[in-house]
Amino acid sequence: MRLPRASSPCGLAWGPLLLGLSGLLVASQPQLVPPYRIENQTCWDQDKEYYEPMHDVCCSRCPPGEFVFAVCSRSQDTVCKTCPHNSYNEHWNHLSTCQLCRPCDIVLGFEEVAPCTSDRKAECRCQPGMSCVYLDNECVHCEEERLVLCQPGTEAEVTDEIMDTDVNCVPCKPGHFQNTSSPRARCQPHTRCEIQGLVEAAPGTSYSDTICKNPPEPGAMLLLAILLSLVLFLLFTTVLACAWMRHPSLCRKLGTLLKRHPEGEESPPCPAPRADPHFPDLAEPLLPMSGDLSPSPAGPPTAPSLEEVVLQQQSPLVQARELEAEPGEHGQVAHGANGIHVTGGSVTVTGNIYIYNGPVLGGTRGPGDPPAPPEPPYPTPEEGAPGPSELSTPYQEDGKAWHLAETETLGCQDL
């Protein structure tokens, strides 16, 4: 719905004028002054007025420090008067008398803090060493405090809302401390060093506060590190000196072990092992140690002598000893002389020689093998036949073939 007159400039000008006239009309109405009649028995100001049922009017209350001297009527309001000495009224009232001031009773354990006036009663408190006993949130009398001393690290806890003298000591909460012995001791929070721009020197406990100190300067920390390094070096040097004085041989052995094989260098070659005295060398040089060998005559090789046969039978043992020798031993060969050289447990052959391996029963010859030598001109003794310990020239018996015993051949292989 449109209001052309209200939206027009003339309507906007009339608005403030109408509001001012309404305020004047309200102010011009007569204000209700007690005593005044009212229909619902409810006065306008409940704190400072009261309803008088005898006259069916609302009357004024007396202010603090006064009492009702004359009751109101339909034509007259309440008449108030100041309370006499040693009496008081603390609130707005319609009482006909004032309350009597009550002094602080020493017998009950009280002492006076502020005297009684017409608008306030005397203010009392318990004497030192005593505490209040409350009843309906009012201290009725005082009693001596119980001698319950809370030790450091604990605090007093009120367990009874009526009697605050019933205390119990409980441990302080984490982050709090208490360092006195008192029945009213309370735990306090630990000091926070970082808030004060300090560093913590010692942490707080339940019975002590946190200890703070100024932050150390960088120069002091550097000096401390240098001194600590020097102390450790001197301590290490002292320990080494004591160990050298008490155990010099052990220290020398340790130094020898450290210097024997430096890192990155090869260990020196080990000396050649000595020949075992219990197993003497069985190989003897077959050719002279010096001088060149004379060229062998052309033609088939001659029959091996008895020493050559014995040497060939002993060759497996010599070969086994050569396998056990160190690699360095094989390199120790005398150069510039032809022949067979024996060094330790090794046999070195220089020059052209023929080796007779002896007859092998049932064996086959290869294409590169030398021609078979003729059979020896002497027979081999029969198996089990007794003979002298020294070598002698055997004789062939009639009707027997030239051969070597099979057991002798197998015996050489077993060696």
Curated annotation (Swiss-Prot):
Name of the protein this chain belongs to: Tumor necrosis factor receptor superfamily member 3
Miscellaneous comment: Aedes aegypti lymphotoxin beta receptor inhibitor reduces dimerization and trimerization of LTBR induced by lymphotoxin (LTA(3)).
Extracellular side: 31-223
Residue intervals annotated with topology Cytoplasmic: 245-415
Membrane-topology annotation of the record: Single-pass type I membrane protein
PROSITE patterns in the record: TNFR_NGFR_1, TNFR_NGFR_2
Alphabetical keyword list: Apoptosis, Disulfide bond, Glycoprotein, Membrane, Phosphoprotein, Receptor, Repeat, Signal, Transmembrane, Transmembrane helix
Molecular function GO labels: identical protein binding; ubiquitin protein ligase binding
Cross-referenced SMART domains: TNFR (SM00208)
Compositionally biased region (Pro residues): 368-380
Modification Phosphoserine, positions: S315
Gene Ontology biological process terms in this record: apoptotic process; cellular response to mechanical stimulus; immune response; lymph node development; myeloid dendritic cell differentiation; positive regulation of canonical NF-kappaB signal transduction; positive regulation of extrinsic apoptotic signaling pathway; positive regulation of JNK cascade
Origin species: Mus musculus (Mouse)
Function: Receptor for the heterotrimeric lymphotoxin containing LTA and LTB, and for TNFS14/LIGHT. Activates NF-kappa-B signaling upon stimulation with lymphotoxin. Promotes apoptosis via TRAF3 and TRAF5. May play a role in the development of lymphoid organs.
